[in-house]
């Protein structure tokens, strides 16, 4: 059996600038609201140039509540790289583990046995701790992080919730929840919130781990392994469950603001195959897509559908000004006019790739200084011009899957399997 490792790859650069189930009656004359469509595999207006003038300030990957990274202030020649090697993380593709970037300019991640480590941005190790029993280590827990001042909140897929000190990794407190967690975690109103495998969102006190509130949504018998996501804005938390219901809650008490289903009730019989992208918040709108050829823009204030497009993607989209960017599983870059919901341009990002013996798929993307960096499941990174959609570079990071790039403190961080 071959050994499996994950690496963190840091690329440095010199920059010029700093509800309950609903019964459905069958009616032969009824209008179909949830139509199935085929993936789009042809270009549209490929020579159209778009204008982008906004550069995102600050560190969008540092405690981002919106999940929208925008147009980052980043550029690189990809000549300098460092790596940090650590052990197996199971189901790398579905669990989609994320690095925690901290307010003291360091990063925190975990190994396959639940060991948590903290390093500098050039991988000088500060500390490494493990707060799991021998039995728990064998279960290879998946960890989700969030920072609250001097502490790191940790939630895992085994149902543990605990707090450790950012400076030392020392344990502050630990509790057991009812079910393991399957989403990213966010800090809001002195609480940490996340969604569990039963499609229940829970809020815990960052001080002692006491559960403050929870909210149940529909829960299919067969569980999906695809990681779920949530975002926060003001005193509202938005999340998507495994059957595609988008819910907005009052973060103070977990009371319902609105809920919008995006799939028919028939989805219950095959909910485990549904893969939604991470949701993002921008322009008072919730955006996401799925592997059923659907892209949604939902009004964050009312839950009303603003528009829907045909995009076959489970990758996190990005919004810059009035442009929405998404990349389909088939390798087509979509640019949507957010004001009208119309697709402005579709570009095939794989058209210059000659050897396609292996099924090549994008795994994520970011935008930076009007460039788009697309990670692939074959270990490559494509650089595109966001204005024109043309390819500008092709870089080999590894030989197998790499995750969506992250940018922090003048470096690009990439998780890869090998």
Name what the model sees in each region:
Residues 319-320, 326-336, 342-383:
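Loop/turn-rich, solvent-exposed surfaces of beta-rich toroidal or solenoidal domains
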Residues 14-42:
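Bacterial Sec signal peptide processing site at the extreme N-terminus
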Residues 43, 58, 82-101, 125-146, ...:
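Extracytoplasmic beta-rich repeat domains
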Residues 120-124, 165-169, 205-209, 250-254, ...:
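Short loop/turn segments that connect beta-strands within beta-propeller blades
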Residues 117, 162, 202, 211, ...:
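WD40 beta-propeller blade core
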Residues 41-113:
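Beta-strand-rich domains and repeat architectures in extracellular enzymes and scaffolds
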């Amino acid at each position: 059996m071959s050994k499996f490792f994950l690496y963190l790859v840091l690329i440095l650069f010199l920059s010029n600038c700093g509800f309950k189930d609903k019964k459905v009656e069958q009616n032969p004359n009824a209008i179909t609201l949830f139509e199935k469509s085929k993936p789009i595999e042809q270009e549209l207006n490929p020579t159209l140039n778009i204008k982008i003038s906004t550069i995102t300030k600050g560190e969008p990957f540092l405690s981002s509540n919106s999940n929208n990274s925008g147009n980052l202030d980043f550029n690189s020649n990809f000549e300098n790289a460092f790596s940090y090697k650590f052990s197996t993380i199971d189901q790398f593709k579905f669990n989609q583990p994320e690095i925690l970037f901290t307010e003291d300019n360091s990063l925190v991640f975990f190994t396959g046995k639940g060991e948590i480590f903290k390093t500098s941005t050039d991988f000088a190790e500060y500390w490494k701790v493990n707060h799991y029993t021998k039995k728990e280590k064998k279960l290879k827990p998946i960890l989700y992080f969030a920072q609250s001042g001097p502490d790191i909140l940790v939630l895992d897929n085994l149902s543990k919730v605990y707090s450790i000190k950012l400076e030392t990794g020392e344990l502050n407190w630990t509790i057991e929840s009812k079910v393991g967690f399957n989403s990213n975690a966010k800090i809001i109103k002195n609480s940490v919130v996340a969604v569990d495998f039963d499609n229940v969102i829970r809020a815990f006190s960052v001080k002692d781990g006491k559960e403050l509130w929870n909210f149940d949504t529909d829960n299919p018998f067969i569980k999906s392994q695809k990681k779920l996501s949530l975002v926060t804005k003001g005193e509202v938390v938005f999340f998507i469950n495994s059957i595609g219901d988008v819910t907005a809650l009052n973060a103070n008490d977990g009371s319902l603001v609105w809920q919008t289903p995006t799939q028919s009730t028939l989805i219950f019989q095959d909910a485990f195959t549904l893969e939604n992208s991470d949701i993002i918040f921008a322009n008072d709108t919730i955006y996401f897509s799925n592997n059923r050829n659907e892209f949604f823009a939902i009004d964050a204030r009312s839950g009303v559908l603003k528009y829907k497009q045909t995009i076959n993607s489970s990758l996190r989209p990005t919004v810059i000004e009035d442009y929405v960017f998404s990349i389909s599983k088939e390798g087509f870059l979509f640019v949507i006019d957010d004001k009208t919901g119309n697709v402005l341009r579709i570009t095939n990002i794989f058209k210059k790739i000659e050897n396609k013996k292996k099924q090549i798929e994008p795994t994520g993307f970011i935008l930076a200084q009007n460039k788009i960096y697309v990670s692939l499941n074959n270990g490559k990174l494509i650089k595109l011009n966001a204005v024109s959609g043309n390819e500008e570079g092709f870089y080999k990071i590894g030989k197998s899957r790499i995750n969506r790039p992250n940018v922090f403190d003048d470096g690009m961080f990439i998780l890869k399997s090998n």
